[in-house]
C-alpha cells in the first residue's frame, strides 16, 4: 500500500471521500479541494490527522450523518471535529 494520497489539482468531490482498510495511509494532500460533503474512513489503522477536513466541517459542507470514522488510529467524532480535535491529544 501507499502512505500518502496526493491529488494536487482536485477541486471537488461530489459526495463522500471513502477509504477502507488502507493500513499504511497516513496523509491526504488535496490543497485545492473546495467541495466535499462527507468522509467515510474505515480501518485506516495508521491515519490520525483529520485537520485537512477542518474547513468542510466549519462551513457545514460535511454534516454529522456524513462523518463516518471507525477503526482508524484516531477516531474523532463529529463533535470532536467541531471542537477542533483534529488529531490525538499529545
Question: What is each of the regions a protein language model found here?
Answer:
Residues 1-89:
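Concave beta-strand-loop units of leucine-rich repeat
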Amino acid at each position: 500500500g501507499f502512505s500518502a494520497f496526493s491529488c494536487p489539482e482536485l477541486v471537488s468531490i461530489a459526495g463522500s471521500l471513502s477509504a477502507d482498510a488502507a493500513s499504511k495511509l497516513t496523509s491526504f494532500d488535496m490543497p485545492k479541494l473546495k467541495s466535499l460533503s462527507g468522509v467515510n474512513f474505515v480501518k485506516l489503522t495508521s491515519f490520525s490527522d483529520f485537520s485537512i477536513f477542518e474547513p468542510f466541517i466549519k462551513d457545514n459542507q460535511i454534516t454529522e450523518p456524513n462523518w463516518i470514522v471507525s477503526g482508524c488510529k484516531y477516531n474523532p467524532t463529529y463533535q470532536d471535529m467541531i471542537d477542533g480535535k483534529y488529531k490525538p491529544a499529545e
